[in-house]
């Protein structure tokens, strides 16, 4: 049985308005409750509406087994509240059994012993099913610490063919110069209520642009592979070119200073609803186009983001995404039958992430703009994705993408601060790069990062 769409939409709406939806059991007969079952608490993070609905329905389907002794209850939290809620509940001794962590934040959770190694709780079948590429993200310090959920290029360029044609722009810009030239042509054709290009603001300004900074620096992150020294000044020329180009989008009035409604997760709506001619967005924007704006599919195209020299078969984005983890305390929490919460939660994760009917459905609903971390799910969804008009370009970006860095997120925050300082405070690229270099050195020193990269294998 499938839950009525209206009920699922109502659940998502209530969650958004209330900021958290705790153990929500709809009144109809389709929400299953097993009397006497051990409750496993899951914290869900607010994503796209279709994604929230999928996960809530998957929980409902898992709970339809009224003999396994497991009852999954969830709390749906807004994105900007998620990490603080997990942290505060952990400190209060009320951490959820299961929650989501982005791949770039796994190492911090491991270092603080927040999460449980999974080798002894997940089934061997599920462990063997993890794809080779996904293993690089979830195996750290010689242990499996997370169950991969999805992978997705963090930034692509989506654009309206109609808006481009009106302005005489014949193709997607490949270089910084072409991008600025296209913006200059498009701006005079727009009304006062429209703007040229959407860009990530706030926190996403950092993580969404990691790949662009990496590309500008000639394929280098801001610090050495062993995390012992800053590489910022070695790559000053590339950073300067990127920063001057990117901040021009603001200073020339091509992108607004304020964020759009819904933030970076929903920024594709700006193009779909005619407020912007193009936008940077994660690959997941494809699903919003297909599901909510099918009339825009013919008009909106996608391309790899511009690079300094126009080379597109290189890394321009991170393969971002999310994994499910078990709180360390789940190994000690036990139900009446003696099974630990870790054992019970593992049953749910296996169902959610690898069940032959449930898991592929997520990527179908995503319109194949994301990739799975399990061989069985990849095999079940790969061919269908080739019929998606956006699939080839997104797959190209994903194949060249880098993993989200494992070092302190403070460094990524400092990257976005360079942009902010130039746009808001009028500082030069030279000034902000010098400050960035000093901050990277300070973070390396204060956090003791030198030699601590778990992925470093030597020269």
Regions found by a protein language model. Give the residues of each.
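Extracytoplasmic "Venus flytrap"/periplasmic binding protein-like
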Residues: 61-132, 137-139, 162-174, 270, ...
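A structural signal for short loop-to-beta-strand junctions that line the ligand-binding cleft
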Residues: 89, 94-97, 126-164, 311-319, ...
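Extracytoplasmic/periplasmic substrate-recognition and gating elements
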Residues: 167, 251-252, 291-367, 399
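Extracytoplasmic/periplasmic solute-binding protein
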Residues: 140-149, 155, 180-231, 247, ...
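Hinge/lid segment of periplasmic solute-binding proteins
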Residues: 101-155, 180, 191, 209, ...
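Glycine-centered hinge/linker elements that transmit conformational signals in sensory
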Residues: 183-184, 228-261
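Conserved N-terminal structural module of periplasmic/extracytoplasmic solute-binding proteins
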Residues: 6, 18-108, 126-127, 309-311, ...
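Long, aromatic- and glycine/proline-rich binding clefts that accommodate carbohydrate-like moieties
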Residues: 24, 300-305, 362-421, 449-459
